[in-house]
Regions:
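Juxta-kinase regulatory segment immediately upstream of eukaryotic protein kinase catalytic domains
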Residues: 276, 287-320
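Short amphipathic alpha-helical interface segments
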Residues: 1-28
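Conserved beta-loop-beta/alpha segment of the NTase-like Rossmann-fold superfamily
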Residues: 125-202
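Conserved core of the sugar-phosphate nucleotidyltransferase
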Residues: 8, 20, 173-249
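ATP-binding pocket architecture of kinase catalytic cores
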Residues: 320-425, 446
Length: 448
């Protein structure tokens, strides 16, 4: 089995065409002295001839390090990327003229990696065309809404060997993929100053990862793709088998599982220069990278906001996802110094809400002065635009002042004589909700 120096030198000769000692040093990153000594060893092993051409035995020596395949994770919602991710997955967005996931697939194929699996979940149909366009394998993660990305790993666990693990929304300015890799690694870039990202602690010349800390300063941070060698894949699979059914495992990133078992899962840090790897956690991040994106992206949500507020897309700033909704997706934003909130109807919300009655009730509450935040709701599609009001404190049923204010509003509403088409029948409504929940198998409490 080749050591790291032998691998780097032989790979430079075999795959990069290096034919002089200086070329080997430059292509492998080894010092000239180390390259010279390593070349002598390769000759002694019969892996290169006197002209530094690889022999037939070189391919056999490199075989254990050949990349088997790649997995692209594309199942998640990416809620921080509101509002664009409410309409389509980040991976299918067009950035600087290319669809993100398509660019990544092309880069993998340019490196000779043709066995590519895309794991989908949220808006999965958006990715199905990739089967015909690129011949990739599509795997559906049916647990994407209830578990973190460890469920994506579970879906492809049987495929993992010497495998690249990628995210569909990464953008690489240079192709980072190679057909042969020596050992498992996590790509990283250096963050100057304070950072809230996952910071790596390494040891030794090979930069073996010995610790992971969330947040730090002037540190190498986890960013971009990962490579798992066969030993790592097998070890991680055993750990995932043991922990997967534990409810505490469901919300964990696979990286959290790795960090908890770091001594059992050797992996090195692969440093990249600043500007090679891009991840877009928010719309603002992407706008910084591609200034034309916001004007070119196909977004009904942005069009709704612009039409209702009489603004341009460039006027929309400070987008912050709101997590209070049970079924809907909402975000707050700012236009010309004023804050607003937009509600995007979630999947299945129509089963619980009659939009026509909701619009009528909202309009009455606005006219009576009970809700001055309301601006507009679309009775067909269910999206709603409101003025954003920051809550000073949440309603507390044990607070007499809170209850008095709520009941005063209720008396105003009932005394108004206003009528909507829908009558309230708590028992009938509860039965219909129960039927909808049962159909989706969402009731999991034994004593319900």
């Amino acid at each position: 089995m080749l050591g790291s120096y032998e691998f780097e030198a032989l790979y430079a000769i075999y795959a990069k065409g290096a034919r002089t000692q200086r070329a080997v040093a430059a292509a492998s990153g080894l010092s000239l002295g180390t390259a010279n000594a390593t070349i002598k060893a390769l000759r002694a092993f019969g892996l290169v001839d006197d002209s530094l051409a690889p022999t037939d035995a070189a391919l056999d020596a490199l075989a254990p390090f050949k990349v088997d395949n790649a997995v692209i994770m594309a199942a998640g919602l990416s809620s921080r990327f509101a509002p664009i991710s409410y309409e389509k997955p980040k991976g299918v967005l067009r950035v600087r003229g290319e669809v993100l996931i398509e660019r990544q697939i092309r880069q993998l194929r340019e490196a000779g990696i043709d066995d590519i699996t895309v794991v989908v979940g949220y808006k999965k149909e958006e990715f199905f065309y990739l089967e015909d366009l690129f011949g990739v394998r599509i795997v559906i993660n049916h647990e994407y809404a209830t578990r973190n990305n460890n469920s994506t790993i579970r879906c492809v666990q049987h495929l993992l060997g010497n495998t690249y693990i990628c995210s569909s929304d990464d953008y690489f300015t240079e192709n980072p993929f190679e057909p042969y890799v020596f050992r498992a690694y996590y790509s990283a870039t250096f963050a100057s100053g304070p950072t809230e990202e996952w910071c790596l602690v390494t040891k030794g010349k090979e930069r073996l990862i010995s610790g992971v800390e969330v947040g730090g300063r002037d540190s190498w941070i986890m960013l971009g793709h990962v490579y798992w060698d066969r030993a790592f894949s097998q070890a991680f699979g055993r750990i995932l088998d043991a922990e997967y059914d534990d409810p505490a495992c469901a919300p964990r990133l696979w990286e959290e599982i790795y960090a908890a078992h770091i001594d059992e899962l050797p992996m090195v840090m692969h440093p990249y220069e600043d500007g090679v790897i891009w991840e877009f956690d928010s719309l603002a991040d992407l706008q910084e990278f591609d200034s034309d994106f916001i004007d070119n992206v196909d977004s009904a949500i942005m069009d709704h906001v612009c039409r209702m507020l009489g603004c341009a897309r460039s006027d929309i700033h400070g987008i912050v996802p709101l997590k209070q909704g049970l079924t809907n997706l909402s975000f707050a934003f700012e236009v010309k110094g004023r804050r607003y909130a937009y509600r995007h109807p979630g999947v299945g919300s129509d089963a619980f809400i009659r939009r026509s009655a909701e619009v009528a009730a909202e309009s009455i509450a606005y006219e009576l002065g009970l809700d001055r935040s309301f601006i507009f709701e679309d009775v067909t599609d269910g999206w709603k635009l409101s003025r954003f009001i920051a809550a000073r404190e949440p309603f507390d049923g044990r607070n007499v002042a809170h209850v008095d204010a709520a009941m005063a509003a209720a008396r105003t509403l009932h005394a108004s004589g206003a009528v909507v088409e829908r009558s309230a029948d708590p028992l009938k409504d509860a039965e219909s909700y129960l039927e909808a929940l049962s159909a989706d198998r969402r009731i999991s409490f034994r004593d319900f």
